[in-house]
Design a protein with these regions (language model features):
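Short acidic/polar hinge/loop motifs at secondary-structure boundaries
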Residues: 100, 107-133
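A beta-strand signature from Gram-negative outer-membrane beta-barrel systems
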Residues: 121-164
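Transmembrane beta-barrel wall of Gram-negative outer-membrane proteins
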Residues: 160, 167-202, 207-245, 269-290, ...
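Conserved C-terminal beta-signal and adjacent last beta-strands/turns
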Residues: 180, 236, 461, 497, ...
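Membrane-embedded beta-barrel scaffold of Gram-negative outer-membrane proteins
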Residues: 187, 280-284, 290-308, 452, ...
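Face-selective signature of the C-terminal outer-membrane beta-barrel domain
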Residues: 230-236, 271-427, 450-452, 510-514, ...
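Surface-exposed extracellular loop regions of Gram-negative outer-membrane beta-barrel proteins
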Residues: 241-255, 358-365, 419-426, 437, ...
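Gram-negative outer-membrane beta-barrel transporters
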Residues: 335-342, 405, 409, 514-518, ...
Length: 696
């Protein structure tokens, strides 16, 4: 059984199922391994092989639409990353991922302040992706409206080398190499397993000024030290250069969705480079006790040119139109698990999580003067220079109690403490010293009762409290155009109650969940313009909804997947300056989402599949006066798999947006100039070839 070490309190373990009735994956929201059916939380597991099936292997949006409660929107803008939200958490993000916790092989892809990204996830070497929703996600600490955990493949025998290539519309080309293997079976001292993957992605982009280039490498090396301990080394590197097409007004979108007028004018773009390494030590102390220690460190460099005119940048307090920042981050998570009895069987997990980030942030004008006129897209004079520190120390405890044969209790608590410290080194007339600091502390409890109605049907009731601090980026700009950090921004807190049901249907699993989340001091977009966004607290909000999911196997060759999400997310207090927004929908969140796919596949020979995706309209501003229309798109895939000796081959083709629907892929919430809309591409095509050679 393969185990995936997770970074925080829930510690899900992922393994191959032992029977078809247990589905293809088993997970746990507690320290012991149970099936997805028996997990007392809303959790979905996506298999890496399924993600790679007839796919470009570039974006998570290709394969996560089947997860209920998860809204994935592809901006078609590789300078800003995907837009992800779980039950509405993360919807305000104008770039990157916020409100969620993301982990890649136990290393946070979310910084201590809650800012995350998906750009370093290598789909080519993914083993599983686990999506946790609901109250238990709060046990991961700050900004955990939901949790996305990515686990890379563990190498096995025989050694295998794979090559893949995909070419599609808009000059899209993705190609890569991967080597996996093992020495020994992993149970004896000196046994080694390895996975090494590297790939490159280039595209001209669907829109003008949206070309991108991305180099990504991922490696995992495991060494069995002795019969009871193992050491795993993790390495990851990503290098991205991407143009930023920006948003469009409604008239611009209807006139020509491929245009990028401000991208061309300001030469907006973003360069990102990140390298990180991690080391995980696992030891079985006794038959009842296990120890796990995860250490990691990394560096991330970003340079971004924004579409800000010269006039605003001339104000003494303005930070300019170029962001230049370097981040160093590191952390350690130590946990001890004990299995025993206290009147009933119980499992206890206690741990301590420490994360630290140091950021050097500079701002420059995005122009130079040439013959008396501004030439945009060039780095000009320094306008900002500061050092920001952030760190957290979170002790946690989780317990699992088997009260009876049918009734179990999972309960946990985490005490999250987050500190910010900013030192301003750019002090000029009209721009004083804006140094400052802040700290936030919160108890985060969660609990769940699960009852087994039958061997194939479980129901559960769970509740929990979470909180979300402002990220450094959210603190970086004040809405009044003054200099310095926005320390008036407060953390938000939320309370969630959920009831759920999971039923095994032959070789399938049907899941359902009802939930309500009440939030105080919700952090929302105040204004957004030219790539710069300021934030404010919105008072009270409410999210309530329902999720349905079905994964059903028919015979040996047919498979149906379906998901439906209804989410009513509204403001309960006014957040608008000059109009009442009480009762308005929170922007960036679809009220209804639907997905269905049906496919036919054998181990060898032809395979084919189709999918349909639906998203209802999405409000673009707090006043609810602008929205992106609803849409439905259809995709088709087909391919042929065959083997020749020790070589496996897979040739495939796909078409997305089959009926050439014109729609908005994502919205920029509260964009001050009405440039809310980021268009999605029309009908597009791709072909690919995957080759694998086994050294047997």
């Amino acid at each position: 059984m393969r185990h995936a070490a997770l970074p925080a309190l829930l510690l899900p373990l992922i393994a191959a199922a032992q029977t078809a009735d247990e589905q293809t994956m088993v997970v746990t929201a507690a320290p012991t391994t149970v099936s997805e059916l028996d997990t007392p939380a809303a959790v979905s597991v996506v298999n890496g092989d399924e993600m790679r099936q007839a796919a470009p292997r570039v974006n998570l949006s290709e394969s996560l639409s089947a997860v209920p409660g998860l809204q994935v929107q592809n901006r078609q803008n590789y300078a800003q990353d995907l837009q992800l939200s779980i039950r509405g958490f993360g919807s305000r993000s104008t770039y990157g991922v916020r409100g969620l916790r993301i982990y890649v092989d136990g290393i946070p892809a979310t910084m201590p302040d809650g800012q995350g990204q998906t750009s370093n996830i290598d789909i080519g070497s993914v083993d599983t992706i686990e999506v946790l929703r609901g109250p238990f996600s709060a046990l991961y600490g700050n900004s955990s409206g939901g949790v996305i955990n990515v686990t890379s493949q563990t190498g096995t025998q025989p050694p295998t080398v794979e090559a893949s290539s995909y070419y599609g519309s808009f000059g899209t080309w993705h190609y890569g190499m991967k080597a996996t293997g093992a020495v020994g079976d992993g149970s004896h001292a000196g046994d080694v397993d390895y996975t090494v993957s590297t790939n490159r992605f280039t595209t001209h982009g669907y829109r003008d000024h949206s070309g991108a280039r991305k180099n990504l490498a991922n490696a995992r090396l495991g060494v069995r030290i002795n019969d009871v301990s193992k050491l795993t080394l993790l390495l990851n590197s990503v290098d991205i250069k991407a143009n930023d097409a920006g948003g469009l007004t409604a008239d611009e979108w209807r006139d020509n969705p491929r245009q990028s007028p401000r991208g061309d004018q300001y030469n907006t773009r973003k360069n990102t480079r990140q390298t990180q390494a991690g080391l995980r030590y696992e030891r079985q102390l006794s038959a009842q006790d296990d120890l796990s220690v995860m250490m990691y460190a990394g560096e991330r460099e970003t340079t971004q040119f924004q579409s800000i005119p010269r006039a605003p940048q001339l104000k003494p307090s303005h930070a300019g139109g170029v962001i230049d920042l370097t981040r160093h981050y590191q952390g350690i998570d130590t946990r001890l698990t004990h299995r025993g009895e206290l009147l009933v069987p119980v499992t206890l997990t206690a741990g301590l999580d420490y994360e630290n980030m140091s950021e050097r942030r500079k701002g420059y004008e995005n122009f130079v003067m040439v013959n008396g006129a501004p030439q945009y897209g060039e780095q000009g004079a320094l306008r900002r220079n500061e050092r920001n520190l952030m760190w957290n120390v979170d002790p946690y405890l989780q317990t699992q109690w088997q009260l009876t044969d049918k009734l179990s209790l999972d309960a946990g608590v985490r005490y999250s403490s987050v500190w910010f410290d900013s030192n301003d080194y750019y002090i000029t007339p009209g721009n004083g010293d804006d140094s400052g600091d802040a700290s936030y502390h919160k108890w985060l409890p969660a609990g769940s009762l699960k009852y087994a109605l039958t061997d194939a049907w479980n129901v559960y009731l769970s509740a929990g409290r979470g909180f979300e601090t402002p990220t450094i980026n959210e603190l970086s700009y004040r809405s009044d155009n003054q200099s310095g950090l926005n320390f008036g921004l407060k953390p938000s807190t939320n309370d969630t109650v959920e009831i759920g049901s999971k039923t095994r249907l032959g070789n399938g699993l049907l899941t359902a969940a009802l939930f309500q989340t009440n939030t105080d001091n919700e952090i929302v977009v105040d204004s957004s313009s030219g790539g710069r966004t300021s934030y404010k607290n919105a008072g009270k909000t409410r999210r309530q909804g329902m999720e349905l999911g079905l994964d059903q196997q028919f015979g040996e060759s047919w498979r149906l997947k379906a998901a439906w999400t209804w989410l009513d997310a509204t403001y309960r207090t006014n957040v608008c300056d000059d109009a009442s927004c009480n009762g308005n929908r929170i922007p960036g969140i679809a009220r209804n989402m639907g997905y269905a796919s049906f496919g036919y596949q054998l181990e060898q020979g032809w395979y084919a599949g189709s999918d349909i995706r639906y998203m209802s309209d999405i409000m673009a501003n707090d006043e609810n006066t602008a929205k992106a229309p609803s849409w439905t798109v259809v995709g088709l895939t087909t391919g042929y798999k065959w083997s020749y000796g020790r070589m496996d081959m897979d040739l495939f083709g796909r078409v997305d947006n089959l009926f050439d629907r014109e729609y908005v892929g994502s919205v920029i919430v509260n964009e001050s100039n009405g440039r809310y809309y980021e268009p999605a591409p029309g009908r597009n095509y791709g072909i690919g070839l995957n080759l694998a050679w086994r050294f047997e």
